[in-house]
Amino acid sequence: MIYYNGNDIVIRDLQQSDAKILTAEENAQGWNTDISKYEMRLKHQAEGRSISLVAEYKGNVAGYINVYPESEWGSFGGMGYSEIIDFGVLAKYRRRGIGSKLMDIAEQVAEKYSDTIYI
């Protein structure tokens, strides 16, 4: 699903092909990332437990964020609140409004499920 389609930025659901791209890009910029993180997000998305969003910038995967409508974790886990977690923009795409747009869309998605959102 596409949540936002602007001039250079598209926000859409995480796809299987994104997992390898994000893992490789994060490792290239010095982050110690394993593909299992994205495989878990894809599994949770398929189970209906989360909405995992990806930002594309000019057609390239540039960032991600995850919404758990009824999070099980954290201080408010199990209380029916939406949680926004695991938010990142690849270094080479920063300072272009991608992170702001990802957070805006994640908040819009989260508030469909709960009046209270935590990060």
Feature locations, PLM:
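A short beta-loop-alpha structural element at the N-terminal edge
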Residues: G6-L22
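Hydrophobic alpha-helical core bundles mediating ligand binding, dimerization, or RNAP-core interactions
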Residues: A19-N27, Y38
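Active-site rim helix/loop that mediates acceptor-substrate recognition in acyltransferases
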Residues: W31-V54, Y64
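Short coil/loop residues immediately preceding or within conserved phosphate-binding loops
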Residues: S50, M79, I84
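A short, polar/charged loop-to-alpha-helix boundary motif
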Residues: S71-G78
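Conserved acetyl-CoA-binding loop-helix of GNAT-fold acetyltransferases
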Residues: V89, R95-Q108
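Conserved GNAT acetyl-CoA-binding A-motif
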Residues: A110-I119
